[in-house]
Amino acid sequence: MVVMGDFNSTPDSAVMEFLLKSQISTEHGEFHGLKYHGFLKKANGECLGNKNGTKFFKHNFRLKACYTDDLLDELKYTNYTYDFKGILDHILHCKDTLRTVGVMGGIDVDWMIKNKIIGCPNVHYPSDHLPIISELELINPNTR
């Protein structure tokens, strides 16, 4: 399974924590005042409790990001606008069946600065989101 797109979520967000760790506390700070609880409960069934009584939402997909922490230094932005520059787009895959072979590097920030590009879209980039690409390969089930 591959999940990819504009998540409007930075790598350190609750959304990414939930997707990559397969669970998140129902009391996570990013959920306060928002109506995620009802949606996640409908989508997920029920919460699980841990030994401290804290409740968690969980999913059974074992996902991994193609652009892992060690590559995030290379990928500075997937969204480059006048007032926000950061990573909002992601490619995730099931870690049991797929492996990341390679990823495309990010934009040349020095080139953007040198050419006085303060945001996208512009004549060089038609969207505020910049492309990301990953090459994946199937993991042979006999070698797992």
Predicted segments with their positions:
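Metal-dependent phosphoester-hydrolase catalytic domains
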Residues: 1-2, 7-144
